[in-house]
Amino acid sequence: MDTNEGDVRFENEGSLEPLPVVRERTVVMRAVGLTKIYAAVSSGGGSGRGALELFRGLDLKVHAGEMVAIVGESGAGKSSLLHLLAALDTPTAGEVWCGETRLSSFTPKQAADYRNRDVGYVWQFHYLLPEFSAQENVAMPLLARGTRRAEAMERAAYWLGEVGLADRADHRSGELSGGEQQRVSLARALVTEPKILLADEPTGDLDGKTAETVFGLIQRLHEVHGLTSVLVTHSLEFAGRCGRVLRLREGRLVDATLESKP
């Protein structure tokens, strides 16, 4: 059971400056004619019948500074769509662009570099490395790209402060509550100062009060740091607090912003 998740203190006054707020309406990410079909696998391991088509000809534009929620029924393909935007998977047809970069042109190394440089990804489960401290976990993406350890740890300390966990920097993941673990994973996603934040059900494993704290924190960071954010969520309440709501229905994204507002 998470405790004290509503009491989040931020301790970065006088430390590193927040990122400038982005005000242009530049298209940061777009998907054009996106199709994803999973081939069925037979019990013998070969191809079987009944392939699963999640979407066909799907289009999406995300503008700088937007906070976009994607909602839909279970199995509609929300997480699969986010995986395509993060180059964690490849589409059957169509293209995903981040700025002027076409993701389908990536080699595996380029895809990994893209995820380290341009995209911050928050999973439903935190995936923190248990043998390392919270600060070391947050620093990992910077260390992976060759940043000096002292600089990486300084940036990690800053982002832990931004998620209200400056006093938990030396704690390992097993010593943190569920909400604290997810806040560490959020800091890890943002430590590289990505062009876009992708979050896949970031509150899905949390109880009501803790989920509110984590979602409120995402909102705060989005506004303070001028982020561009795309969130998959099953919570219509949280979705309604985003600037734009898209519903994935029958393989298409439809604007559901008005119906999602309270």
What are the residue ranges of the model-derived segments?
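ABC-family P-loop ATPase nucleotide-binding domain
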Residues: 1-37, 255-262
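ABC family nucleotide-binding domain
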Residues: 27-241, 245-248
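H-loop (His-switch) and adjacent beta-strand-loop-beta switch element
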Residues: 245-258
